[in-house]
């Protein structure tokens, strides 16, 4: 049974989302068709996509953003957390604020890891204290 702390593979996820009762328990609401389309599309990806063989971050981002409901931030999150592109930097409100207020730039190889620290720093208030807020 899915939901016991495991992450289903794309094929399993597509099957689970096709089950109305199971999908209702997830409470995905309007996001369900987007997730279902993404899982179905992931099935068609070449295995190299998941192994990152000869696939650049830009190629992965472009392909992900072609999926309904997936924009730059979500694509960056998938690339960083799901596909292991440590250079992917998801930009949300907190990160955009940090960029604007500090003029910071991101490490070419580990920007995604750097982003996680900056996100926590700004969101948890340390950034506010440093900014005099």
Where are these regions (language model features)?
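HhH-family (HhH-GPD) DNA N-glycosylase catalytic core used in base-excision repair
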Residues: 1-133
């Amino acid at each position: 049974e899915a939901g016991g702390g495991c992450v289903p593979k794309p094929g399993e996820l597509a099957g689970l989302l096709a089950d109305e009762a199971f999908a209702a328990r997830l409470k995905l609401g309007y996001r369900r068709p987007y997730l279902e389309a993404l899982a179905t599309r992931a099935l068609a990806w070449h295995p190299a996509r998941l192994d990152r063989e000869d696939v650049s971050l830009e190629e992965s981002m472009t392909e992900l953003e072609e999926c309904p409901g997936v924009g730059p931030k979500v694509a960056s999150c998938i690339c960083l957390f799901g596909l292991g592109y440590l250079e992917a930097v998801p930009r949300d409100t907190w990160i955009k604020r940090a960029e604007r207020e500090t003029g910071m730039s991101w490490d070419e190889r580990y920007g995604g890891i750097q982003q996680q620290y900056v996100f926590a720093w700004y969101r948890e208030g340390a950034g506010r204290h440093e900014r005099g807020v």
